[in-house]
UniProtKB/Swiss-Prot annotation:
Its EC number is 4.2.1.33. It catalyses: (2R,3S)-3-isopropylmalate = (2S)-2-isopropylmalate. GO terms for molecular function: 3-isopropylmalate dehydratase activity; 4 iron, 4 sulfur cluster binding; metal ion binding. [4Fe-4S] cluster binds at residues 355, 415, 418. Keywords: 4Fe-4S, Amino-acid biosynthesis, Branched-chain amino acid biosynthesis, Iron, Iron-sulfur, Leucine biosynthesis, Lyase, Metal-binding. One of its GO terms (biological process) is L-leucine biosynthetic process. It comes from Shewanella sp. (strain ANA-3). SUPFAM superfamilies: Aconitase iron-sulfur domain. Belongs to the aconitase/IPM isomerase family. LeuC type 1 subfamily. This is 3-isopropylmalate dehydratase large subunit. InterPro entries: 3-IsopropMal_deHydase_lsu, Acnase/IPM_dHydase_lsu_aba_1/3, Acoase/IPM_deHydtase_lsu_aba, Aconitase_4Fe-4S_BS, Aconitase_4Fe-4S_dom, IPM_dehydratase_rel_enz, IPMI_cat. Binds 1 [4Fe-4S] cluster per subunit.
Length: 474
């Protein structure tokens, strides 16, 4: 048995959080790390709880486990009768498991229910320097707070429930620095899509990425969560942003954040959670924020992305035969022709929501485009707030009225049309401007065609009936 490194050499943010959580390093085996927070939902937890019951085990730390219903829930009604038989079974099973094991549950009737990666941060469950896991690939979202957060499989969910630990190999480190500031109309979603476009959907494989630079520091916590949310879409294990005053201001006073003297002590400790001067990364990527335009995907993975003022790429211009074949396949599925201006691409569906872009800042941005306008004829557009708190705040600000008057549908919280796992899905041939995180074949429904964009770009597309450059009048 070896012990964690206590070297005084400069360390990255990831190294600091990792070192603080290694509890054992068995010779010849993966290190064992401690898990501070475990988030669960109705889809990846049933088998894990069943395994505990069969083995006669209890939860190691039920107070560190938080559950919500989000993937299969209806955004039209809070009634169980609105769910499909399978969805109803899953949410009822989660409710029973939480009751049996003493887990805090935010069910469909709870005012704080919502998408797991939205309600966790807004309740203060997510804190700097913690290790957070969830049976969901977009757990990286929580890294925006300087946490080490990543998705795990169902067997690992069971292991964490039983032991509050996990075997993990240490990842390599990558620094992605976005220098300077973005121009008007460019958002966090555009930044992360530009990053993925630069390094590809597998450019971060094997790495934990730290996002930094002036453009990242200027983002709100909502924006940082958007960036970290899509770290997995570049293949990374996790994404992180060092906590700063923006982080502390967001967290102060939230339900599960430290209070009183504990708060002052926590902030003092969190201020040390930054990469030391001289710390080395295994890889570095640099982008100039001023060169980033509003982005949208043209193909069937998040790396197939261009600026709004660019045309659909031509596979013939790609020298790599493997990439060229992938581009040709994507264009065939998505139904676009090389050379077509992206502003000529018409859409008939719009989805504003998901764990990427369903927070209050996102809805304000979309509402700004929708105010005083009308959704184009033939377009169906839905707005799905990420949580009960977001919904209540948006309604207090009158955003729901702006959307409804413009012809958008205003829904209940949930994962919704991000994935074809509930009643919100696309039909074959539909073309959707979506604020979600994946544009894979069939992701939003069999035969559906998805274009990833920011909330402002999605709302503008709903109004125009096609993609537009929101930096210009339309």
């Amino acid at each position: 048995m070896t012990t964690p490194s206590t070297s005084n050499a400069p360390k990255t943010l990831y190294q600091k959080v990792w070192d603080a959580h290694v509890v054992a390093t068995p010779e010849g085996e993966a290190p064992i790390i401690y898990v501070d927070r475990h988030l669960v939902h109705e889809v990846t937890s049933p088998q894990a709880f069943s395994g505990l019951k069969v083995a006669g085990r209890k939860l190691r730390a039920p107070e560190k486990t938080f559950a919500t219903m989000d993937h299969n829930t209806s955004t039209r009604s809070a009634s169980l009768d609105a769910l499909s038989p399978m969805a109803r079974t899953q949410v009822e099973t989660l409710a029973q498991n939480c009751k049996d094991f003493g887990v805090r549950l935010y069910d469909i009737h709870h005012p704080n229910q919502g998408i797991v990666h939205v309600m966790g941060p807004e309740l203060g469950i997510t804190l700097p320097g913690t290790v957070i896991v969830c049976g969901d690939s977009h757990t990286a979202t929580h890294g925006a707070f300087g946490a080490l957060a990543f998705g795990i499989g169902t067997s690992e969910v069971e292991h964490v429930l039983a032991t509050q630990t996990l075997r993990q190999l240490k990842a390599k480190t990558m620094k992605i620095e976005v220098r300077g500031q973005v121009t008007d109309g460019v958002t966090a979603k555009d930044i992360v899509l530009a990053i993925i476009g630069k390094i590809g959907m597998d450019g971060g494989t094997g790495y934990v990425v730290e996002f930094c630079g002036e453009a990242i520091e200027a983002l709100s916590m909502e924006g940082r969560m958007t960036v970290c949310n899509m770290a997995i879409e570049m293949g990374a294990k996790a994404g992180m942003v060092a906590p700063d005053q923006t982080t502390f201001d967001y967290l102060e006073g939230r339900e599960f954040a430290p209070k009183g003297e504990d708060w002052a002590e926590a902030v003092a400790a969190w201020k040390a959670l930054k990469t030391d001067v001289g710390a080395e990364f295994d890889a570095t990527v640099v982008l100039d924020a001023a060169n980033i335009a509003p982005q949208l995907t043209w193909g069937t993975n998040p790396g197939q992305v261009v600026a709004i003022d660019a045309p659909v790429p031509n596979p013939a211009d790609e020298a790599n035969p493997t990439i060229r074949a992938s581009m040709e396949k994507a264009l065939d599925y998505i139904g676009l022709t090389a050379g077509t201006p992206m502003t000529d691409v018409a859409i008939n569906k719009v989805f504003i929501g998901s764990c990427t872009n369903s927070r209050i800042e996102d809805l304000r941005s979309a509402a700004k485009q929708a105010k005083g306008r009308k959704v184009a004829s033939g377009v169906t557009a839905i707005v799905v707030p990420g949580s009960g708190q977001v919904k209540a705040q948006a309604e207090a600000e009158g955003l729901d009225k702006i959307f409804i008057e413009a012809g958008f549908e205003w829904r209940l919280p949930g994962c919704s049309m991000c994935l074809a796992m509930n009643d919100d899905r696309l039909e074959a041939g539909d073309r959707c401007a979506s604020t979600s995180n994946r544009n894979f074949e069939g992701r939003q429904g069999r035969g559906s065609r998805t274009h990833l964009v920011s909330p402002a770009m999605a709302a503008a597309a709903a109004i125009a009936g096609h993609f537009v450059d929101i930096r210009k009048p339309y």
